[in-house]
């Protein structure tokens, strides 16, 4: 928590875990400023769609640039508290799992990505929505505006790799409190657990 008592909270989890809905509800509950990543200024023109090491490195730097530009917005609202729908650990989980073959192991991958991100503001608290990738993919396929992926198996494997990274990151290797919630439960349960956990830090 920063000196004046305000708080910066990041909500993390794989696609389909319910981050955006929860971020909005937590912002309403706390009165905190709601933001998200990628930001509205993010340029998708250079994003690489392939899930491989080279594309993941390119995408990581694009998202990191957006995040550094996001810092001013976050700083301007910290005094009243900030909620972010995705933040740095989304990049580490998504792009890290794709670029891992460039490094010795997961630890070295994460260490390098955190070093590149060392000047950004880190959150005071993380809410991690844990969900089985297969269930998350079913949810995504039910969304009317969700682009249907022709290779469901490939996307499922990607979500499994990302989930593995999230689980490892939030297993205790970072010195940030993490509220872990079973996002496979009914949404009201997820919301209540998030608020209950959050109240211990407010």
Swiss-Prot record:
Catalysed reactions listed for this entry: dTMP + ATP = dTDP + ADP
UniProt GO cellular component terms: cytoplasm
GO molecular function, one term: dTMP kinase activity
InterPro entries the record matches: P-loop_NTPase, Thymidylate_kin-like_dom, Thymidylate_kin_CS, Thymidylate_kinase
Any coiled-coil regions, as ranges: none
Gene Ontology biological process terms in this record: dTDP biosynthetic process; dTTP biosynthetic process; dUDP biosynthetic process
Keyword Transferase: yes
Enzyme Commission no: 2.7.4.9
Record keywords, A-Z: ATP-binding, Kinase, Nucleotide biosynthesis, Nucleotide-binding, Transferase
Enzyme category, top tier: transferase
Sequence positions that bind ATP: 13-20
Superkingdom assignment: Archaea
UniProt similarity note: Belongs to the thymidylate kinase family.
Protein name (Swiss-Prot/TrEMBL): Probable thymidylate kinase
Protein source organism: Picrophilus torridus (strain ATCC 700027 / DSM 9790 / JCM 10055 / NBRC 100828 / KAW 2/3)
Lineage per the UniProt record: Archaea, Methanobacteriati, Thermoplasmatota, Thermoplasmata, Thermoplasmatales
């Amino acid at each position: 928590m920063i000196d004046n008592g305000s708080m910066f909270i990041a909500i993390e989890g794989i696609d389909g875990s319910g981050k955006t809905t929860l971020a909005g509800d937590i912002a309403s509950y706390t009165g905190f400023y709601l933001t998200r990543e990628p930001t509205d200024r993010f340029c998708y023109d250079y994003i690489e769609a392939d899930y491989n090491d080279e594309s993941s490195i390119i995408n990581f730097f694009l998202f990191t640039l957006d995040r550094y530009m996001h810092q001013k917005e976050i700083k301007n609202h910290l005094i009243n508290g900030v909620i972010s729908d995705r933040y740095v650990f989304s990049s580490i989980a998504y792009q890290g799992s794709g670029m891992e073959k460039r490094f010795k192991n997961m630890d070295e991958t994460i260490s390098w990505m955190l070093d590149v991100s060392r000047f950004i503001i880190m959150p005071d608290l993380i809410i991690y929505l844990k969900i089985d990738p297969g269930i998350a993919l079913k949810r995504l396929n039910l969304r009317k505006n969700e682009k249907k992926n022709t290779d469901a198996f490939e996307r499922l494997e990607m979500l499994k790799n990302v989930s593995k990274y999230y689980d490892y990151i939030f297993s205790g290797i970072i010195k940030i409190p993490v509220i872990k919630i079973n996002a496979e439960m009914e949404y009201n349960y997820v919301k209540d657990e998030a608020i209950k956990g959050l109240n211990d830090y407010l």
